[in-house]
C-alpha cells in the first residue's frame, strides 16, 4: 500500500505533463507535429483490430481497479495498457501504432514530403506571386511563365549549338571510338587516344552535346510536377482558371473534348522531333548517323505512349506541356532561319560540303578558298579532309566548273590514294574535258580495285557499275571499242540491283552496251537488253523499235542515250 501511495503521488505531480502529451488533450493553440497530423488524417487510420484491442484494454483496466482477477492494478494500467503480450507504451504509440505487426513509421514519410515541398514550393510560390501581382487567369499565368522561362534558357541553347557545330567540324579528323579491327589496341587505349587527339586539335568536350537537353529536361519535370501538385491539391483558382474546353485545370481530360489535349501533345512532340533532327549538326556526321537514327526512332515511337499518358494528367499540367512544346517548335524554326542563324553564328559548317555555290576558289594555285560562314576568312583547302574535297569538287563539277573541281580531286587522292569515289569523279571530270585516255585510266583503276574486293555492299556495287560504265564509254571514244564493250559487258552480266539508285545506273549501262554491240552487228542481242530497259523506262521504246526494224541505229539516238547517262 505504501508503494501504491508513493506511485499515486508521483502520478498526481506528473498529471499535467502526461495530459499535455495525450492526443485527446491537445491545446487548440498547439501546432501538432506532422506525424500526429498524418496519424489523425483520413489517409491514415488505426486498424480495426488494434482499436478493439485498445478498447478491451481500457475496459479491463477500468474493471480491474482494486481487483486481482486479471492481475491489473489501476496504476499499472496507466503505465501499460496490459500485461498479456499487447502492452503498448504511450510514448511509443506516437511513433508506432503498436508492436503487434501494425507499426507505421512516419519519420521517413515526413522527410519525403519535406523534400518534395523543398523542390516544388519555390515554383508554386513564384507562380502564386505572378498571379497575385498581375491578376491574370491561371491559364495565362501558366502559359506566359512557360514562355518566359524558356526564353531565359535561350542563351544556353545558343552556346550549346555553337559548341556542337565546332564538334561536328572536328569529328571527321578524330579517330574512331572503338579500336579498328587488327589494330591490337584495347577499348580503353582507343578511348585514351581519342581523348588525346580531341584535346590536341582543340575539339570541345562532348558533354556539350547533352548539356542543354539535361538542363531543359530537369526544369521541365520540376515545372510540370509543381503544376501537377497545384492541380491535385485544388490550388485556389485552379477549379475555374482555365479556358475553352479546359475550364477546370484540376481535372484530367474527359468528355467529348477530352482527346484534344492528348492529341495536341502527341502531335507537337512528333513535329518537334522532326525539326530537331533536321537542325542538328552532330547527327549528320557519319560517326553519329546510326545512333541518331535509333534515337529518332525511339522518340517517334514515344509519340503513341505520350498520347495515352496525357489522359492521366491534370489539364493544368497538359497546358504547360503544350505551351512548352509549342515554344520549342517556334524556337527551332526561328533559329534554323538562314538570316537568324547567320546573325547568331549558328550557320551549319557543312557549307563547304553542301553549299558550294557560295564558297569561291579565289586562288586555286595558292590553295585558298572562301568560307562564307566565317565572314570572308580564307581557309586552306589542304586542311580539308578527302571527303570534304570530293564533296566540294562534285558541286563545282555539277555547276560546270571542271577546271576548279579537278585540282581538288587530285588533292583528295594525294591524301587518300585508295579513295574510290575520288577516282571515279576525277575520271568523269576528265571525260567532260575530252581527256579520254586519262579518264579511262582513273576509271579502270577504280573498277579494278572494286573487283579485287568482290563488292557486296550496295554502295560498292553502285560504284562498280558507274566506274565500268564510264570506263567503257571513255575507251569507245578513243576508238578502243572492244575494251569499252568489255567494261560495259561486265555490268550487263551483273545481277540487277534492287537499290533504286544503283538500278538507274545499271539501266543506263545497258543502254550504252546495247548501242555499242548493235554497232558491231549484234542486233538481236542488243534488242534483248533494250527490252529489259524498256520494261522499266518506256522512253527507250523508240530506240528498241529502231533496233528491231533497222540495220543501223541513228547516231543521234546513241548520242542521246550517252547524254542521258551523263
UniProtKB/Swiss-Prot annotation:
**SUPFAM superfamilies found in the cross-reference section:** TPR-like
Q: Where is the transit peptide?
A: 1-44
List the protein's name.
ALBINO3-like protein 3, mitochondrial
Q: Which family does it belong to?
A: Belongs to the OXA1/ALB3/YidC (TC 2.A.9.2) family.
Provide ranges: composition bias, Low complexity.
Answer: 555-566
* Residues in coiled coil: none
UniProt organism field? Arabidopsis thaliana
Q: Which Gene3D superfamilies match?
A: Tetratricopeptide repeat domain
Q: What does this protein do?
A: Probably required for the insertion of integral membrane proteins into the mitochondrial inner membrane.
